[in-house]
Amino acid sequence: MDSSSDEVLFVGTADAEHVEMYLKAIWHIKERNEPVKISTIAKMLNIRQPSVVQMLKKLNGQQLVEYNKAGVSLTEGGEKVGSNMMRNSRVLEVLMDSSLKVKIDEEMVCGIEHHMNKQFTDALCTMLN
């Protein structure tokens, strides 16, 4: 097989996607002006509370959230990732609904949003007005 025609496949990092989903969930809960609680995150992500605690400790160590007995809040870095994920999600929803005229498929949106970079999202925004 000629090396110029070799197909390159990219494998996403599930760990990075998990981090993004937690940050998006926290951002979304905060946006609704609700207290960010472990139980709320667990319910939103359909996972058990001990798993949420474990991930919050990890995110705290990565300085993406501030997690302590008082609660959970996003750091500046966590806020940036969370808001980017929400933006990607909303742009995809507008694309599906307004341009493609298909029913919004949240599972599909969730699968795509993790792979969008700023340039792609900006281009979609421009295309969608």
Regions found by a protein language model. Name each.
Residues 32-42, 70:
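Short acidic, hydrophobic short linear motifs in intrinsically disordered regions
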Residues 56-57:
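Short, hydrophobic-biased segments on the C-terminal half of alpha helices
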Residues 60-70:
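A short, conserved structural fragment
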Residues 70-88:
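Basic, amphipathic "hinge/linker" alpha-helix immediately C-terminal to the N-terminal HTH DNA-binding motif
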Residues 50:
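Key DNA-contact positions within bacterial/archaeal DNA-binding proteins
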Residues 1-24:
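Short alpha-helical segments that sit at the start of domains
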Residues 90-129:
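Amphipathic alpha-helical dimerization/coiled-coil segments
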